[in-house]
Amino acid sequence: MPLTMCDISDSPYQGYIYSCWVDQRNGTSDTDVFFSLSTDGGEAWSPALRVNDDNTTRHQFFPWMTIDQTTGIIWGVFYDRRNTTGSATDVYVVKSTDGGESFENFKVSESSFTPTSSVFFSDYSNIAAWDKKIYPIWSRLQSGQLSVWITIIEDTVTVPIEFTQFSASVYSGNVMLE
């Protein structure tokens, strides 16, 4: 299911429109998550960017995305089989700090699970983000039963400060910037 979201944050990407979907343009055994953006209100769209960064021909599917409207950072969650065999499935979260030009991928599920056709699980994933706290939620099969999982991610990465001029001295084995 494709999704669309608008950046209304006070970031450099304010006004951007984003779209995310899955397709099999790389083969029927390689479903991937794709992303496109518009900077002009939807008149023109960027070429499709593959969000999942694996080098496999495995499936990634059922994505959901959001924008932390306090930072403009895009977050997403999807099911992923890059590290597994058969139908065993993991859950990955993605992050873009550059308005959707690139995505960092990281696994959030503690272990893989194997879906079955007798238990529907796909529409039960989502992600919310606010003020550098991210809440991906997903469902999985646990001992034959559908269970819901959430992890709380605190995005506390600090931005390095660029020094234009400084001096340093060593005092008792410590470097002091002045």
Describe the function of each predicted region.
Residues 157-178:
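Pro/Thr/Ser/Gly-rich low-complexity, intrinsically disordered linker/stalk tracts
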Residues 1-157:
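Extracellular, repeat-based ectodomains that mediate carbohydrate processing or recognition
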